[in-house]
Amino acid sequence: MSDVITPGEIDIVGILDLLPHRYPFVMVDRILSIDPGKEIVGLKNVTFNEQYFQGHFPGEPVMPGVLMLEGLAQVGCVHAFYTEPDAVGKKLAFFAGVDKARFRKPVRPGDQLIYKVQLVKEKRSIIFMSAKGYVDDQVVVQAELMASFS
């Protein structure tokens, strides 16, 4: 992992430096922008080549809602490193919880899923975030997330 992180766009190589996830469980392709301590925006290009479309659902492919939540959580964990840059290379950011998850519209192959995660507060060792996913400027998923370091 890198020892230093700077705000801005992050490609998949930079994301893999921060997250422990690997294929086939990386649910974010790029970080588009970061305002440390406030908001991060990431994206996932949803393609028919995703393994989960083999069974979810044959003839009517839909991205599983739990994987949309996972994508939001991964983007949130990247943001967590910007709230605690001393943790980079020394700790793992973990998804600690989810509340008020809602799935508004199906996400299908060919969609570009934009994740927007905002820092709400930090309390003790927990980072609280508000997260939404968009396709074509329409909310498709939203939730309140929690993350922590170990």
UniProtKB/Swiss-Prot annotation:
* Keyword terms, alphabetized: Cytoplasm, Lipid A biosynthesis, Lipid biosynthesis, Lipid metabolism, Lyase
Top class in the EC scheme = lyase
Please provide, in alphabetical order, the Gene Ontology terms of the cellular component aspect for this entry: cytoplasm; membrane
Q: What is its EC number?
A: 4.2.1.59
Q: Which residues form the active site?
A: 56
This enzyme catalyses: a (3R)-hydroxyacyl-[ACP] = a (2E)-enoyl-[ACP] + H2O
Q: Which GO terms are recorded in the biological process aspect for this UniProt protein?
A: fatty acid biosynthetic process; lipid A biosynthetic process
Q: Which GO terms describe its molecular function?
A: (3R)-hydroxyacyl-[acyl-carrier-protein] dehydratase activity
Give the main localization category: cytoplasm
Superkingdom, natural source: Bacteria
Coiled-coil residue windows: none
**Localized where?**
Cytoplasm
Q: Does the keyword section mention Cytoplasm?
A: yes
InterPro entries per UniProt: FabA_FabZ, FabZ, HotDog_dom_sf
Q: Which protein family is named in the record?
A: Belongs to the thioester dehydratase family. FabZ subfamily.
Checking HAMAP family in the record gives: FabZ (MF_00406)
Q: What PANTHER family does the entry give?
A: 3-HYDROXYACYL-[ACYL-CARRIER-PROTEIN] DEHYDRATASE
Q: What does this protein's UniProt record list under function?
A: Involved in unsaturated fatty acids biosynthesis. Catalyzes the dehydration of short chain beta-hydroxyacyl-ACPs and long chain saturated and unsaturated beta-hydroxyacyl-ACPs.
Q: What name is this protein filed under?
A: 3-hydroxyacyl-[acyl-carrier-protein] dehydratase FabZ
Source organism per entry reads: Desulfotalea psychrophila (strain LSv54 / DSM 12343)
Q: Which gene encodes it?
A: fabZ
